[in-house]
């Protein structure tokens, strides 16, 4: 069921929800394939503009997450040349999300019991937000796998003190951190696990103190390394509280109503979330600590979370577990028929309204980008640098299969920096002005392609 749901429109071009971020991620993989060389220390992507970092990025450096996922995908794509990059990248995300479902089952079975584990895995499998973000070309599906895997293995280590589980937990945590340093907000979960087993003298085991040091050495080394490429480091200070929204009424509304209640739970699913408060047992410590980590994450990364809903991927596992646990609490506390009726109604309505929110995410809003991009790919040299104005949105540039600029203006400056082609889906003043000066390769109702290296006589 989980696989079938995730295959819905998996052949979408990179032009659905958050296409700009997907395009940036996918283009790192594509540049590796094009270069026929996988240099993990110097990842490059399509955008040569100064939009991300404030500095011209003519080498196209992309210094964000450590690109081991992109490198792995590129290696497979280079080996099997008939594979479509976008389709395969989406499929890889789907497959890793299937493994995350297995890990959630194993983790919850250890903390609670098999019944809650099965239900948590099911909720994670069918939650509309989870389904959509399990087939995107982003680091998030991999981050969720490695972070939950690390927690699971750490729980096993705390329980049995096995070296294998300890080492696997470090590896999982290190890889998660290399993708998203936000994994640090899951620290309360690790601390709660330690507390649960503190009577077994786990606090005297030096390995628990070494674990965060060993796990975070790679990301600290990566962060130090990328300082050598300032033009490839996107500005990130704004993520914290760039617009001053932290703890304001709008912050509460966006994160807890618009996202959690509306987008994740479809309004009605919040009944299951609240039902968790009716049952307190030893497992609640770990789950409550997980929610504490979520709250700290929302407070610290305030603007980032409000601005982009994909930042809430981090909370998916605990949301799924809490929905499942709340459902079982209702089943336990109420009479069988009443509980069944409530569960069916709340689940059905919650899924319906959440799906209604998410289905629009699959829509392609700019088919003209696809058409224009294909035309550029067929007409111009493979190494041509392209200006594809979309107000900085890189999804249009991605469709051209070329590097370049996702924004117009200062065209002469861009030509001096190597721009060869101008393609636009808006026949605006800029396109008209360039049409007067340079040779037009194609002009249709949907787009215009101009050769910036061929001036009219």
Language-model region placement:
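Signature aromatic-anchored transmembrane alpha helix within multi-pass, membrane-resident enzymes
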Residues: 1, 171, 213-216, 280, ...
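Short helix- or helix-capping micro-motifs
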Residues: 2, 120-125, 173, 177, ...
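Extracytoplasmic catalytic/substrate-binding loops of multi-pass membrane glycan-assembly enzymes
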Residues: 13-28, 36-51, 61-73, 83-87, ...
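Transmembrane-lumen/periplasm boundary regions of multi-pass, lipid-linked membrane glycan transferases
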Residues: 25-35, 175-178, 184-283, 294-308, ...
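Transmembrane-helix motifs of polytopic, lipid-linked glycan transferases
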Residues: 75, 82-111, 149, 153
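Membrane-interface transmembrane helices that cradle and orient dolichyl/undecaprenyl
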Residues: 110-115, 150-168, 176, 200
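Short acidic/glycine- and proline-prone juxtamembrane loop motifs at membrane-interface regions
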Residues: 132-142
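Short periplasmic/luminal acceptor-recognition loop of GT-C membrane glycosyltransferases, typified by
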Residues: 362-366, 376-426
């Amino acid at each position: 069921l989980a696989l079938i749901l995730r295959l819905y429109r998996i052949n979408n071009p990179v032009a659905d929800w958050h296409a700009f971020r997907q395009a940036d991620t996918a283009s790192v993989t594509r540049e590796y394939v094009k270069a026929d060389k996988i240099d993990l220390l110097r990842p490059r992507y399509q955008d040569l503009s100064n939009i991300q970092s404030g500095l011209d990025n003519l080498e196209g450096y992309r210094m964000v997450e450590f690109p081991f996922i992109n490198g792995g995908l590129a290696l497979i794509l280079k080996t099997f040349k008939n594979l479509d990059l976008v389709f395969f990248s989406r499929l890889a995300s789907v497959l890793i999300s299937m493994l995350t479902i297995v890990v959630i089952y194993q983790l919850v079975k250890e903390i609670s019991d098999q019944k809650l584990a099965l239900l948590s895995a099911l909720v994670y499998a069918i939650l509309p937000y989870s389904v959509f973000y399990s087939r995107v070309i982003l680091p998030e599906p991999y981050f969720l796998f490695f972070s939950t895997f690390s927690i699971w293995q750490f729980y096993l280590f705390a329980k049995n003190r096995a070296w294998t589980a300890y080492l696997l937990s470090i590896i999982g945590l290190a890889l998660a951190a290399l993708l998203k340093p936000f994994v640090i907000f899951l620290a309360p979960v690790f601390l709660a696990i330690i507390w649960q087993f503190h009577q077994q003298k786990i606090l005297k085991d030096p390995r628990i103190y070494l674990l965060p040091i060993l796990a975070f050495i790679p990301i600290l080394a990566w962060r130090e390394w990328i300082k050598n490429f300032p033009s490839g480091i996107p500005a990130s200070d704004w993520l914290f509280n760039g617009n001053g929204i932290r703890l304001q009424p709008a912050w509460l509304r966006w994160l807890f109503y618009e996202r959690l209640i509306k987008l994740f739970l479809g309004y009605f699913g919040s009944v299951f979330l609240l039902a968790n408060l009716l049952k307190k047992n030893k497992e609640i410590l770990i789950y409550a600590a997980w929610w504490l980590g979520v709250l700290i994450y929302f407070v610290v990364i305030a603007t980032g979370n409000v601005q982009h809903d994909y930042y809430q991927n981090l909370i998916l596992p605990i949301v799924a577990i809490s929905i499942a646990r709340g459902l079982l609490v209702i089943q336990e506390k109420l009479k069988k028929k009443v509980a069944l009726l409530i569960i069916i109604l709340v689940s059905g309505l919650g899924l319906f309204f959440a799906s209604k929110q998410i289905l629009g995410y699959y829509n392609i809003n700019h088919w003209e980008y696809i058409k224009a991009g294909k035309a550029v790919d067929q007409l111009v040299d493979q190494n041509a640098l392209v200006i594809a104005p979309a107000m900085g949105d890189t999804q249009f540039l991605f469709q051209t299969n070329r590097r370049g600029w996702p924004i117009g203006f200062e065209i002469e400056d861009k030509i001096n920096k190597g721009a060869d082609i101008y393609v636009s889906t808006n026949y605006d003043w800029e396109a008209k002005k360039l049409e007067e000066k340079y040779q037009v390769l194609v002009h249709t109702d949907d787009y215009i392609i101009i050769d910036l290296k061929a001036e009219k006589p």
